[in-house]
């Protein structure tokens, strides 16, 4: 934990010193669940390396979870659901190997991120919101993401990035009978450049 905080402080110092800064938000769609995220990117002047800080809110779906229509109540209902949330906090980098070699602001990249995950395991069942989350089990574990993607930069100081890769989340103790929640993740990011 102390090493991660030290790395984060060094990373923030690098972020503030660079000139190619942007922030964004987006959607995560994965084999284990879905969610939203917020990120902050700081790149070098050559635009081939970005340091990334990111926080996510990820709702984990159960292996047998499905949504059915209840004709009696005229509502959609989740059956066999689980109440498990992940909040990963990651720091990493994007490397753009083809900067200046491809026209039209199209930039493929590879990415690596690592950090901590805070998991909240709520009580299962059909209780109220308060009953579900009142005495939820929590734990910290390591998390990471390895993948590739494409960033489209536009002249109006914004960009869209599509990442596809492997989310690596292994818990220290079981949450809903599992410790390994790694899997495929599609990460869609909408970014805005910060003009100094």
Q: What do these predicted ranges mean?
A:
Residues 23-26, 74-81, 130-136, 171-178:
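Extracellular loop and loop/strand-boundary signature of outer-membrane beta-barrel proteins
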Residues 23-27, 38, 51-55, 91, ...:
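Membrane-embedded beta-strand positions of outer-membrane beta-barrel proteins
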Residues 28-32, 81-86, 102, 136-143, ...:
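Short sequence motifs at beta-strands and strand-loop junctions characteristic
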Residues 17-21, 45-49, 98-107, 154-160, ...:
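Short loop/turn motifs that connect adjacent beta-strands in outer-membrane beta-barrel proteins
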Residues 22, 32-34, 60-64, 100, ...:
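Sequence/structural signature of outer-membrane beta-barrel proteins
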